[in-house]
Design a protein with these regions (language model features):
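Residues at structural and domain junctions
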Residues: 20, 49, 120, 363, ...
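Beta-strand-enriched, solvent-exposed domains that form extended recognition/catalytic surfaces
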Residues: 19-22, 51, 58-222
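Catalytic cores of extracellular degradative/oxidative enzymes
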Residues: 239-445
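Zn2+-dependent metallopeptidase catalytic core
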Residues: 127, 139, 148-164, 171-259, ...
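Beta-rich interaction/scaffold domains
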Residues: 1-83
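Generic structural signal marking isolated hydrophobic packing positions
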Residues: 7, 63, 134, 194, ...
């Protein structure tokens, strides 16, 4: 039995050595046991020695007498639920990507002014006040992911809130992000995301996260089973019609180059009522953004890091009005009136928003050190227009009129935007690799 302590001070401050408080702790074997009931941090399977009602009941008796019962009882309750019935947690369990910080890569390595998102869709919507249980399995000592709660149709600069996760159980109450001052009045709540800005070299094995809480909404990842998705969309639309005051109107899809967050009502109208193929729909803007990457000389090739666009994506989402559309540092905001149009695949629908969509994408892709606001970003719009057969919006006749006089000394800054665009685009006409070579040089330098 311990009766005496001896403290030896090896270094003091100002030749004085002092101590304030010493706390003595007894090893808590019960807490250690309760913290290690499960095979891993997702808490979906009990270890063999605890996989029985007898074992858990015996532990529960001890926990009920423990001074820290309120901290230990949650694990006992989870264990009892697992013993009661076998559950399938696959739809709520996510193995996280380990792409590193692609937003930082887009900015620092590729020179883009705004492009890049690291949000990973869960297909779960959370509403303010709901309590989420988030279970995390990861290697000991590894950096851990975050969970991100969002507000559907939120405001620029105020639409999401991030929480750092720890290994094991995390209990988080969904925050309220909604603001009554907004012009559009969506239902409070929005999609829940996971964000893991680390690589295998930093983390070892990929973290696995399981989420309890919220409800599932229609999510389509390129290549998913289309029939299965449509059934989920129909069921969610029925719920939305039955209880619109308590159901967030949201639909989301993911492709190689971007994540889109819109409305379930628009998705139902286009995919169910109009019969548009969902895979063709999600590829419409993915293809055009990929074309913009290629115009800029980007390619998925890790062996060429200054031009490597592997895993670089953006987020395009329904947001509060801020002009017709806008490009922010972490998303492109669009408004309600084009929700159906974005999902349609006919050329008239595509052309009706083609310039504006690629104009905003161009803002994000534009290399900051050579960006000429509202001019160079339109290289991507014009490229899309030409590729889609919608014409070339460079004003060549105006350029010719300016060049015709012997004294042609109009300052570039005094020219209108179509002429300024033409000064760049004519070089692309001269050599179709001009823009790719120019951007590649900027990235290299």
């Amino acid at each position: 039995e311990l009766k005496r302590f001896k403290f030896v001070y090896k270094k003091g401050n100002l030749n004085q050595a002092a101590s304030s408080v010493f706390c003595l702790y007894k090893h808590d074997e019960l807490k250690n046991t309760v913290d290690n009931l499960f095979t891993d941090g997702t808490m979906v399977k009990l270890k063999d020695e605890y996989n029985s009602e007898e074992a858990i009941n015996a532990l529960e008796e001890k926990v009920n007498k423990h001074p820290l019962k309120h901290q230990l009882v949650s694990n006992i309750e989870i264990a009892k639920e697992l013993l009661k019935e076998e559950k399938d947690f696959s739809d709520r369990t996510f193995t996280l990507t380990q792409y590193g910080n692609t937003h930082e890569k887009a900015r620092n390595q590729l020179g883009m002014s705004r492009y890049g998102t690291d949000l990973q869709s869960t297909g779960i919507v959370g509403r303010p006040g709901q309590v989420f249980k988030v279970f995390v399995e990861a290697e000991d000592g590894a950096p851990l992911p975050q969970i991100v709660f969002s507000q559907q149709e939120g405001r620029f600069g105020h639409w999401k809130q991030e929480y750092q996760l720890k290994k094991g159980l995390n209990v988080i109450t969904v925050p309220e992000i909604y603001n009554d001052s907004w012009s559009q009045k969506p239902i409070k709540g929005g999609p829940v995301y996971l964000m893991n800005r680390y690589t295998p070299q930093q983390q070892g094995k990929a973290p696995v996260v399981r989420i309890e809480g919220g409800e599932e909404f229609p999510l389509y990842n390129s290549g998913d089973d289309k029939a299965e998705f449509l059934e989920k969309l129909k069921a969610y639309k029925a719920k939305l019609d039955k209880d619109p005051a308590n159901t967030v109107d949201v639909y989301e899809f993911n492709t190689t180059r971007f994540m889109y967050t819109g409305t379930a009502k628009a998705a139902y109208q286009v995919y169910v009522n109009e019969g548009v193929d969902v895979e063709e729909s999600v590829q419409v803007w993915n293809t055009r953004i990929q074309d913009a990457f290629e115009l800029s000389g980007l390619k998925d090739d890790p062996s060429d890091p200054t031009n490597d666009s592997t895993n670089v994506r953006t987020s395009i989402r329904l947001m509060q009005p801020y002009g017709a559309a806008y490009a922010a540092s972490d998303h492109i905001g669009v408004q309600r009136h084009i929700q159906e149009i974005i999902l349609r695949t006919d050329q008239d629908s595509i052309n009706s928003i083609l310039w504006g969509m690629m104009h905003e994408v161009g803002h994000q892709l534009d290399i900051a050190t050579r960006e000429w606001g509202e001019i160079t970003n339109n290289m991507y719009s014009n490229n899309a227009y030409v590729n889609d057969g919608a014409g070339d919006r460079a004003a060549y006749s105006k350029i010719h009129n300016l060049l015709a006089p012997d004294d042609s000394s109009v300052n570039f800054n005094n020219l209108d935007g179509t002429i300024q665009l033409g000064m760049f685009w004519q070089l692309q006409l001269k050599k179709d690799t001009y823009w790719a070579e120019l951007d590649s040089l900027y990235r290299k330098k």
